[in-house]
Regions:
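Conserved class I S-adenosyl-L-methionine
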Residues: 73-81
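Bacterial signal peptide processing site
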Residues: 22-24
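A short glycine-rich, Lys/Arg-flanked "PGG" loop and its adjoining helix->strand segment in the class I
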Residues: 173-185
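N-terminal secretory signal peptides and thylakoid transit peptides that target proteins
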Residues: 2-18
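A short acidic, Gly/Pro-enriched loop at the edge of an enzyme's catalytic core
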Residues: 148-157
Length: 289
């Protein structure tokens, strides 16, 4: 079983649960008489209570505003998983004349056995609320995938808590190059990632799920990006980053045993639940004009 598959176990279970859980109602993405605002998209009744509960940790309005999301933008979301951010981005872009490309897992990637299931669950999600989500175009990102979006077409590309997976799979460099190719000159690469403490030698496989911020910036610069600014929107000073099962010990995954092992029902989550979700870097990088 691949490193990437193991680290994304929570993604698969979340994606496959889309059809099993109670469905949030679909609403028209454009309220009568005015365009849908980002705040209204975040508050939308189509988002589940479980997803909304995570807003306190992920700060979607502040984060997307920091990256410069605008009405009518063309956005590429790499590896959307079960669609936590898609539930915000797709209705907002559909209502404002924008476009969302979802560069999902490469379904035929031999190193990721669950990829086809994850992609199929995501397609079902979009199909079941087609009026809400609009025309989301699903592309792919993986070891041998083609373009994530047409060249020089995107205003904003998003890497949302996935870079550690790509490092483990040896495709992080490709992610940066594919993002660079998709962006318009002057376009923005927005990164949210679990942040390791600075100093020492970076773990190039990100085995515990944390990545040094300086190393992320270095990879981006090597692909041609310019660092515009950083933010502490998603920082969590309570995160000690020394958890027994890596970042996945914390919510929302709450792992209780080593990767690939059955969950331990006797594991005490209290300490880790009190920390909350991980300390995360939030970066805004630019493709030069």
């Amino acid at each position: 079983m691949s490193l990437i598959h193991l680290s994304r176990r929570g993604l698969l279970s979340g994606a496959l649960a889309l059809s099993a859980c109670g469905r949030a109602p679909e609403e028209a993405p454009k309220p009568k008489g005015k365009a849908l605002t980002l705040e209204a998209a975040v508050a939308g009744a189509w988002r589940t209570p479980q997803d909304k509960a995570r807003d306190a940790w992920r700060h979607p309005v502040e984060t997307l505003n920091f990256w410069g999301l605008k009405p009518g933008a063309t956005v590429v979301e790499f590896w959307p998983g079960a669609g936590w951010y898609t539930d915000i981005l797709a209705p907002f872009l559909a209502a404002t004349g924008g476009k969302l490309y979802a560069a999902n897992l490469q379904a035929d990637d031999p190193g990721e056995p669950a990829a086809a299931e994850i992609v199929a669950a995501y397609r079902r999600k979009l199909r079941e609320k087609a009026k809400l989500y609009g025309d989301v175009e699903i592309t792919a990102f993986g070891p041998t995938s083609g373009p994530a979006a047409p060249a020089d077409s995107a205003d904003l590309v998003l890497f949302l808590r996935n870079l550690h997976n790509w490092m483990a799979a040896g495709i992080a460099e490709k992610a940066f190059h594919d993002a660079f190719a998709a962006l318009k000159p002057g376009g923005v690469l927005g990164i949210e990632e679990h942040r390791a403490d600075p100093g020492g030698v970076p773990d190039l496989l990100a085995a515990d799920g944390y990545v040094q911020q300086a190393y992320v910036i270095q990879m981006a610069k090597e692909a041609g990006f310019i660092l515009d600014k950083t933010s502490e929107i998603n920082a969590n000073p309570k995160d000690t980053k020394d958890h027994p099962f890596g970042v996945w010990t914390l919510p929302p995954v709450r792992r209780s045993s080593p990767r690939g092992q059955p969950e331990d029902p006797t594991f005490d989550h209290t300490k880790y639940d009190a920390i909350g979700e991980s300390d995360r870097m939030t970066l805004r990088l630019l493709k030069p004009t």
